[in-house]
Amino acid sequence: MNRFILLALVAAVVAVNSAKLSRQIESAIEKWDDYKEDFDKEYSESEEQTYMEAFVKNMIHIENHNRDHRLGRKTFEMGLNHIADLPFSQYRKLNGYRRLFGDSRIKNSSSFLAPFNVQVPDEVDWRDTHLVTDVKNQGMCGSCWAFSATGALEGQHARKLGQLVSLSEQNLVDCSTKYGNHGCNGGLMDQAFEYIRDNHGVDTEESYPYKGRDMKCHFNKKTVGADDKGYVDTPEGDEEQLKIAVATQGPISIAIDAGHRSFQLYKKGVYYDEECSSEELDHGVLLVGYGTDPEHGDYWIVKNSWGAGWGEKGYIRIARNRNNHCGVATKASYPLV
């Protein structure tokens, strides 16, 4: 590959002609081979340039953002991860929450009612009480909704029956299309809960392992890991009610706006991006708690499904009590067990 040609191409894409930018591009290109080795990346000759261009732009974005973080202008750091080479259009395919898929369906949910005079702790983290399975990885399939749904049901099942069982996302990807879900092309957690209720269960992860692609349904009622009796929606946009719900009920499925390069490249800290919407939701994740950072304020603890190498060992802390940042409280629900 002619890296001088690539240098010119990237500069043209960024459309800024400056000595500083040229140095940043050169520095990023020098890190490319190390990145490929560190993350075990292999590309065909025809596709490597595309991924390298994306990597270079992301490296520059990381460097500029982290400079602002060091100056106290940002509350979180960004860094390289296994998806730092993805062009933004490919990255967006990971975000498979499809709110429109549910608009034409009749809702069959219950509404969350907070216990009377309830007092909840200042901090909650359900990872400490064995209600949360290890971080999983959806791969390049837009099945985030399935991971969010299984995560909530895993927690409810463990809370009620005392046993944490990893459940099958592939079962939901393959078998819940009649409920409005579209496998690797997206879906909704509530529709997954409806499928599980009517199907009288979802298989265990061990019996129906994840493949990361749409396949023929082969649910087996003999290997069911958990069931639900329906689901509960929390009040839309109400962070205080969501705080009470996660404190009293356990892990909760939520949808967020993850359609930003800052989210793709998040490394650590309390995530706050002024561009993050409370309505344009595109990614299903699992809320497992909340807390307060002494420097950057209140946050939610959110489990992602992009592997333990992303973010804070697979998790992200999202700003809390900042006008429903990224829509954490807009579409939240949990299954009834």
Curated annotation (Swiss-Prot):
Pfam families, A to Z: Inhibitor_I29, Peptidase_C1
Disruption phenotype: RNAi-mediated knockdown causes early embryonic lethality with embryos arrested at the 100-200 cell stage. The few larvae which survive have incomplete gut development and die at the L1 stage. RNAi-mediated knockdown at the L3 larval stage causes a growth delay, adults are shorter and thinner, and lay fewer eggs.
Result after altering residue 35 to A: Probably causes cpl-1 misfolding resulting in its accumulation within the ER and loss of endolysosome localization
UniProt tissue specificity: Expressed in intestine, pharynx posterior bulb, hypodermis and cuticle (at protein level). Expressed in germ cells, developing oocytes, sheath cells surrounding germ cells and oocytes, and in the eggshell (at protein level).
Gene Ontology MF terms in the entry: cysteine-type endopeptidase activator activity involved in apoptotic process; cysteine-type endopeptidase activity
One of the protein's GO biological processes: apoptotic cell clearance
Active-site residue list: 144, 283, 304
Effect of residue 32 to A: Probably causes cpl-1 misfolding resulting in its accumulation within the ER and loss of endolysosome localization
Propeptide position ranges: 19-119
Origin superkingdom: Eukaryota
Variant or mutagenesis effect after changing residue 230 to R: In yq89; temperature sensitive. At the restrictive temperature of 25 degrees Celsius, causes an accumulation of germ cell corpses in the gonad in an age-dependent manner. Accumulation of abnormally processed yolk proteins
Catalytic activity: Specificity close to that of papain. As compared to cathepsin B, cathepsin L exhibits higher activity toward protein substrates, but has little activity on Z-Arg-Arg-NHMec, and no peptidyl-dipeptidase activity
Name the record gives this protein: Cathepsin L-like
Gene coding for it: cpl-1
